[in-house]
Amino acid sequence: MSLEPDYNPDFNLGMRTEVQQLNQVLMSSSTGMGFIMLLSGEPGVGKTLTAESVAEEMRQPLYIMSASELGETAVEVEEALEQVLELTSKWNAILLLDECDMFLEARSTSDIRRNRLVSIFLRQIEYYRGVMFLTSNRISDFDPAFESRIHLTIHYPALDIQSRLHVWKTFIQIGHLETKIRDKDLKALAKLELNGRQIKNIVKTARLLCKQERVPLAMEHIQMVLQVKKGSLL
C-alpha cells in the first residue's frame, strides 16, 4: 500500500491525523506479525518526525540507527542487524533505520558484493516481528523484492511555500514563548528554500541567542543565524 500525504493547512493537525491513521493501521495488523513501513522523500520533510510521533503515540521507545552504521561487509551487516533486531524486540521498541537507499536500490549482475548485502538485509527484515520504519531520500529504482516485504509506503513531497510557512510557525510557537516575529516576517522566511530540519535548527539556534540576551525571540535573531549559515541577510 502506498500513500502520498497532503499537507494540511494546520501543520500540527496534519501530522496528528497522519499519526492516528498509522496507529489504526498498526493496531489492525495481526498481533505478533512484523510491520514494515517505508518513508520516502527529501531530507527534512518529516520522515523522522513521523516515526517519533508514532512511537510517542504508541508509548514505545524508538531506536534510531543509520543504515551506514550496519557496516560495509556482508558479515558486518548480518551481525549488526541481528543485534539491533534482537535488542529492539527485547525492548519492545520501534526501529527506525535511516537512509536505507544502499539496500533498497535494485540489484544488478555487475555488483555481486552489494547483491549479497541486499540479500542479507532482505532475509533479516523478513522475519522481524516488530514495527520498523525505513527511510529513503528517493523513491525510484527500488529492488522488486522489497515490494512483498514493505507493508506501507509513504512518500513526502518537497515543502512548498505554504508548507514552509506552517513549519516556521510550528517551531517558533513551540513552548509558547514570547516572540516579536510578525506574520509578514514568517511569510518572508517561508520564501527561503529550506527543509524542515534546517528550519528547526535555525529556530533552535536563534532561541539560544535571545536567551543569552534575555529578550523575546525577534527577526533579528533569525537573520543573524541565517547570515552565519547562508552568508546573507533577508
PLM region spans:
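Walker A/P-loop NTP-binding motif of AAA+ ATPase domains
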Residues: 2-188
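C-terminal engagement/docking regions of AAA+ P-loop ATPases
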Residues: 10-29, 200, 217-234
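Surface-exposed beta-strand edges and their flanking turn/coil or helix-capping segments
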Residues: 64, 77-78, 168-169, 204, ...
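Conserved AAA+ ATPase small/helical "lid" subdomain
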Residues: 154, 176-227
